[in-house]
Structures are given as C-alpha cells and as structure tokens.
Amino acid sequence: MKLTILRHPVLWIFTAALLLSMVLPAQAVRIKDIASFSGVRDNQLIGYGLVVGLAGTGDKKDAVFTLSSMKNMMDRMGIGVDSSALKTKNVASVMVTARMPVSAKPGTRLDVTVSSVGDATSLLGGVLLQTALKGVDGKIYTLAQGSLTVGGFSSQGRAASVSKNISTVGIIPGGGIVERGIPFEFNQQDKLTLHLRTADFSTAQQIAERVNGAMGGPFARAIDDMSITMDIPAQYRNNMVPLMASIENLDVSPDTAAKVVVDEKTGTVVLGRDVRITRTAVAHGNLQITVQEGEQVSQPGPFSQGQTVVTPTTETNVREENRHLVIIEGATLQELVDGLNSIGATPRDLISILRTMQVSGALLAELEVI
C-alpha cells in the first residue's frame, strides 16, 4: 500500500512523488513482513534497580524510595549504616525493561532499557547494579547489570541550564543475561497459525491460497480476517523450521481498506493509495480576525489641576478570503490532490475538508483522527 504524507504548507510540493506512487501497482511482499507465527513472539520483562556513579545528577535527598533501596542493599551486603548518613546525589532509582524472545535460552544476552523514576537529572556515566527482571508470572528470567549508554546530556547552574535529547533514559547493549528459558515446545505442535498485523479478509484468504499452492494441498485455511491456520505435513513433524522458513518467504500482494489518518496536533495527513471521493463541489475560505490593543493618553491643560487619563483602545480587523466553488472528483489520489491544490488548501485546511466530505458521504474511505 502506497502512502502519501502531507505535512508542508503547500500540497503541490508532493505532486511529483504522488504521480510516481500512483502508477505503481500493489507491491508483492513476503508473508513474514505482514504476519507472524502464533507463539513466536517477545515477552516483556521489568525490574527495579539502582544506578550508581552519577556525577551529582542523581535523585534529590527527599527521594525516600532511593534512600530505602540503598539501605536495603547495604543490609543485604552485611554493611550496617544509618539512613540519615546516606547521600543520593550520585544514585538514581530506575526501572529496567527488556524484551525476551520465546526462543531465548539461558546465557542469551538481551539489550535492556533503563529509565529514571525519581528526580535525577541525568544518568550519564552511571552503572546499573544487578537487577532481577521478572515476567508477568512473577518469576525471574533475566539479570541485568552494566554501564549505561545515554543518547543525551544535561547540565545546569544556578541561573541557566542546557540539555540535548533525553538524558534520563539509557540502554545497556547486551546488559541482560537470560537465567531461565520460557517453556515452549516449539517442534511439538500439530498446527501452525499465522496472525496478520493488519486485519483483512482478502489478504488472509490470499495467504491461505498461496500456502496451499506452495505446499501442494489444502493444508491452510483462513479462519477469520487476521488468522490463517494450517496442518503440518507429515514430513515436517518434529522439524518445523524448514516449513516455517519456506512459508514466511512466500510473496503475496496485501489488500487493505481505503483509509485516511489525520493527526490534528501536527497537521499531518496520511492518505492511503485507494482513497477515492465522489463528484463534489468544494469551497474553503479562511476567516482572519486581528485584534490590536492600544492606549490613548489624555493630558490636562496647564494649571488646570486635572489628571492624566489613560484610555484603552481596541482595533478589530476582519478579513475573509473569498474562494470559488471547485468541482472535485477523485478517481485517483493524484486527481484528489490536484483538486485540493486548485483551491489552495494546506494540510490543516485538508483536515477540515476531509471531515466535511465524510459527513456529506463524498469521502469513500475511513477517516481516523489520532
């Protein structure tokens, strides 16, 4: 599916790119790019830990949970210390997260993300102490530890500060070591199931037919708009990797519904390749209102014993752009954009126009506002 993104003040800037995208047919893609096998997924892990070695950019002294964590850590190490003697300026409380593939085995290394949960200003130069990462079942699957890599910096003084990117989030490449594998009998399944990332009946049926053609029999069938289930041929029992590798590299031409996505916060409009509109007349004008405040000072005459009076004044100017009706009929996305160009529509104008077209029934596509 070809997408056209309109973000700049004038739509015609994208005309050349749109023209190229419109003449291309729907592209064939690999099944692995639009679907995944059931059970073959990542599992999210999370844990709480401490980052030490910060250059005075850690949590402030009123971070009670950081003080409590430091006290508990010292106690576990057999070091008795009074909480009032602990300083937190070089320490930060953090949440540690990771994604663990279902096929990860003990000893596999994972990348971990470390995020500050207190009021630390930067994790630059910090070291994460050993942190247990748990799954939703409460069991420990990974231990994480190591030096952080931070993609930003932050520095401040009494009257000014400077920062670049986010310095309170860092990563540790390969910083997590899997201690427990996820119980999953990969080669003991009787069936395989493919899940589409975008639901569509046509694409699901097309994948089933493509798989059956490649396997030489009615092994696969679409059970709904997102799932395709298939029986495993006898020669692939207990040896499913060659079968899955063959299936995921088959080419299909995915079909999707016509859709327009609008982000009103940024003025971004994304139009799908199959968006159409019926013959309709459009006029879109801008109403510009300018309000200017001022003050008028009245001075009393000499020796009149009067007082200076300041009177506020307001000047209002209203200007409306008069635009003619334009007949637009979008057989293709290029024709639709050309028609909107003819009335001088900007992307933010386009949002209002598309909303109105949807209400009138002229927009033959789903309109989603995010």
From Swiss-Prot:
<comment type="similarity">
    <text>Belongs to the FlgI family.</text>
</comment>
<protein>
    <recommendedName>
        <fullName>Flagellar P-ring protein</fullName>
    </recommendedName>
</protein>
<dbReference type="GO" id="GO:0009428">
    <property type="term" value="C:bacterial-type flagellum basal body, distal rod, P ring"/>
</dbReference>
<dbReference type="InterPro" id="IPR001782">
    <property type="entry name" value="Flag_FlgI"/>
</dbReference>
<keyword id="KW-0975">Bacterial flagellum</keyword>
<keyword id="KW-0732">Signal</keyword>
<keyword id="KW-0574">Periplasm</keyword>
<feature type="signal peptide">
    <location>
        <begin position="1"/>
        <end position="28"/>
    </location>
</feature>
<feature type="region of interest" description="Disordered">
    <location>
        <begin position="295"/>
        <end position="316"/>
    </location>
</feature>
<comment type="function">
    <text>Assembles around the rod to form the L-ring and probably protects the motor/basal body from shearing forces during rotation.</text>
</comment>
<dbReference type="Pfam" id="PF02119">
    <property type="entry name" value="FlgI"/>
</dbReference>
<comment type="subunit">
    <text>The basal body constitutes a major portion of the flagellar organelle and consists of four rings (L,P,S, and M) mounted on a central rod.</text>
</comment>
<dbReference type="GO" id="GO:0005198">
    <property type="term" value="F:structural molecule activity"/>
</dbReference>
<dbReference type="GO" id="GO:0071973">
    <property type="term" value="P:bacterial-type flagellum-dependent cell motility"/>
</dbReference>
<dbReference type="GO" id="GO:0030288">
    <property type="term" value="C:outer membrane-bounded periplasmic space"/>
</dbReference>
